[in-house]
């Protein structure tokens, strides 16, 4: 391992971060796939930390914000997706504390409602399935459906 390798790996990592924010684990994986040694990767990650270019909490918050803007999702699904991105559980939980699951569930239900046909019970079942698939918990779904379908 040489300074040249470290410089190349750092430039590559900065390039990735220039495109979009990445988690620490994503950068580690990308550099590993590019053939850099573990020692070089750790040096690069330390350097990115000192430059404040790598922040898993910021990444998690931004990921949640952008993900739910496009497609409202529940806590279960977001937690799973953050885990897939390599965000540590404690950081994911901190980012998810700011998340309003009830509002997102209502938003997802309102988006789906115009496309549902049939009687109220049929619509309730379809909507329930849709919200479960989006990763919302049963209590939030129940409250949302009661609010929407009793009016």
From Swiss-Prot:
Keywords: Cytoplasm
InterPro entries: RecX_HTH_1st, RecX_HTH_2nd, Regulatory_RecX, WH-like_DNA-bd_sf
Record localization: Cytoplasm
Top-level division of the source organism's lineage: Bacteria
Any one Gene Ontology BP term: regulation of DNA repair
Key word Cytoplasm present: yes
Signal sequence residues: none
Primary location class: cytoplasm
GO cellular component: cytoplasm
HAMAP family linked: RecX (MF_01114)
Family per record: Belongs to the RecX family.
Annotated function: Modulates RecA activity.
Protein name: Regulatory protein RecX
Species, as recorded: Prosthecochloris aestuarii (strain DSM 271 / SK 413)
Organism classification: Bacteria, Pseudomonadati, Chlorobiota, Chlorobiia, Chlorobiales
Encoding gene per record: recX
